[in-house]
């Protein structure tokens, strides 16, 4: 084990000592406050991280971002077939616009869209 790290009895290192060691090694860590969501855009989809906790670690001038939160992947162009819209409209009795929105919100999942509209 590493000296001063604790390890015995489930005790960790003293936070002040850890901060001092990190400073000596040229490492700065800070939390980005009030982050609502983080979006990572790729060619095929957007990765949306909601309720995000973002930590920035700076080591020798390079920044590394650590993001923790609720991850959701959203396809960039979700084509909703007319038959799917019609089916949702027939099953739930809603307008075309409401059916289209429900399908978009469910990433094209018919059952999820119908359940969401039926329970609303």
Curated annotation (Swiss-Prot):
It comes from the Archaea. GO terms for biological process: protein transport. Pfam families: NAC (PF01849), UBA_HYPK (PF19026). The keyword Zinc does not apply. Contacts the emerging nascent chain on the ribosome. InterPro entries: NAC-like_UBA, NAC_A/B_dom_sf, NAC_arc, Nas_poly-pep-assoc_cplx_dom, UBA-like_sf. GO terms for molecular function: RNA binding. This is Nascent polypeptide-associated complex protein. It comes from Methanosarcina mazei (strain ATCC BAA-159 / DSM 3647 / Goe1 / Go1 / JCM 11833 / OCM 88). The gene is nac. SUPFAM superfamilies: UBA-like. Homodimer. Interacts with the ribosome. Binds ribosomal RNA. Residues 12-80 form the NAC-A/B domain. Keywords: Protein transport, RNA-binding, Transport. Belongs to the NAC-alpha family.
């Amino acid at each position: 084990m590493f000296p001063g790290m604790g390890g015995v009895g489930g005790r960790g290192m003293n936070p002040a000592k850890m901060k001092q060691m990190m400073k000596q090694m040229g490492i700065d860590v800070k939390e980005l406050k009030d982050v609502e969501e983080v979006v990572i855009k790729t060619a095929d989809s957007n990765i949306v991280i909601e309720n995000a906790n973002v930590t920035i670690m700076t080591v020798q001038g390079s920044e590394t971002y650590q993001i923790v939160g609720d991850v959701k992947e959203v396809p960039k162009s979700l084509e909703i077939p007319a038959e799917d819209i019609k089916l949702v409209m027939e099953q739930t009795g809603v307008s075309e616009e409401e059916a289209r929105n429900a399908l978009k919100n469910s990433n094209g999942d018919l059952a999820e869209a119908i359940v969401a509209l039926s329970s609303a």
